[in-house]
C-alpha cells in the first residue's frame, strides 16, 4: 500500500545525483508554470535505503529517481528518469511537441531523450565510476568508457551545431535529460570538456542556464560538492576498509578524457 500525502501532487524519490536532477528540473519547471506541488524524499543509497521493503514497492529496480503521482483517484508510480520526463510532459502538455500535430518534432525530442539514457548517461557514469570510485585501477574499463564518453560528447556537440536545443528549436525534455549530467561541467571540468573542444555544448549550457529552474539546480549541484564522500560511495561496492579508504585512481578534479 502506497502512503498518500494529500497535501502535495507528487512524491519525488531522490538522492541528489545526475538522474535525479533531471526530475528536479522538470518539477521546478512545472512548479513555476503550472503550480504543481511536490515533496522530496531522499533515499540514502550509502545506507542501502533503496533496498528497503518500502522503496522496493515504489521501484522494484531499487534505483532513484521515482515519483508517485497523487493527483488522481489512485496513485500512479513512475520510475526510470526518461519515463518520468515523458509522463510529466504528456500529463501537462509541455516540453514535448504533440505527436498528432507535430510528429517529427515529437519524435526528435523523444529520440534525443532516450539517446541520453542509453548513451550519454551510461558512458559518463561508468567512466566516472572507474576513474574515481573504483577501489582498484582497471585500465581496460577506463579506456573503454573514455572512448565512449568522448564519442557522445562529440556527437552532442555536432547536434548542437545545427540546433539551439537538443531536441530542436524549443526547450524540451531532451534538454532536461542531458542537463542532469552536463550541468556538472559548470563546476568541475570533468572529462576535460572545455569550451574550446565543445563550444556548442557550452553555448547550450549558457542558454539553458538562463532558466530559473536550471539556476536552482546549479546551486544544488554546487552545494552537493561540499558533501561529496568517496568512502561512502565505495562502501556500496566493497566491504574492505582498505579499499574503501584507498586513494582514488585520480582526483575528482582530474577526471578527464584522453583525446586522440
Swiss-Prot record:
GO terms for molecular function: glutathione transferase activity. InterPro entries: Glutathione-S-Trfase_C-like, Glutathione-S-Trfase_C_sf, Glutathione_S-Trfase_N, Thioredoxin-like_sf. SUPFAM superfamilies: GST C-terminal domain-like, Thioredoxin-like. Residues 7-96 form the GST N-terminal domain. Residues 102-228 form the GST C-terminal domain. GO terms for cellular component: cytoplasm. Belongs to the GST superfamily. This is Glutathione S-transferase domain-containing protein DDB_G0280881.
Amino acid at each position: 500500500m502506497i502512503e498518500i500525502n494529500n497535501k502535495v501532487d507528487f512524491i519525488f524519490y531522490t538522492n541528489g545525483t545526475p538522474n535525479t536532477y533531471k526530475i528536479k528540473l522538470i518539477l521546478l519547471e512545472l512548479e513555476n508554470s503550472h503550480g504543481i506541488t511536490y515533496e522530496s524524499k531522499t533515499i540514502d543509497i550509502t545506507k542501502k535505503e533503496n533496498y528497503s521493503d518500502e522503496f522496493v514497492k515504489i521501484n522494484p529496480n531499487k534505483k532513484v529517481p521515482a515519483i508517485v503521482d497523487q493527483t488522481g483517484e489512485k496513485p500512479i508510480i513512475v520510475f526510470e528518469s526518461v519515463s518520468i520526463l515523458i509522463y510529466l510532459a504528456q500529463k501537462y502538455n509541455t516540453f514535448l511537441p504533440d505527436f498528432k500535430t507535430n510528429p517529427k518534432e515529437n519524435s526528435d525530442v523523444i529520440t534525443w531523450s532516450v539517446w541520453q539514457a542509453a548513451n550519454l548517461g551510461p558512458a559518463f557514469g561508468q567512466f566516472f565510476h572507474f576513474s574515481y570510485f573504483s577501489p582498484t585501477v582497471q585500465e581496460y574499463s577506463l579506456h573503454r568508457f573514455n572512448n565512449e564518453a568522448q564519442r557522445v560528447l562529440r556527437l552532442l556537440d555536432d547536434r548542437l551545431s545545427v540546433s539551439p536545443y537538443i531536441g530542436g528549436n524549443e526547450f524540451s525534455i531532451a534538454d532536461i535529460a542531458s542537463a542532469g549530467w552536463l550541468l556538472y561541467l559548470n563546476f568541475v571540468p570533468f572529462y576535460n570538456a572545455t569550451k574550446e573542444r565543445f563550444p556548442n555544448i557550452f553555448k547550450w549550457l549558457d542558454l539553458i542556464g538562463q532558466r530559473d529552474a536550471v539556476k536552482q539546480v546549479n546551486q544544488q549541484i554546487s552545494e552537493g560538492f561540499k558533501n561529496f564522500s568517496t568512502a561512502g560511495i565505495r562502501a556500496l561496492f566493497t566491504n574492505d576498509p582498505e579499499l574503501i579508504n584507498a586513494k582514488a585512481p585520480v582526483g575528482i578534479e582530474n577526471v578527464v578524457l584522453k583525446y586522440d
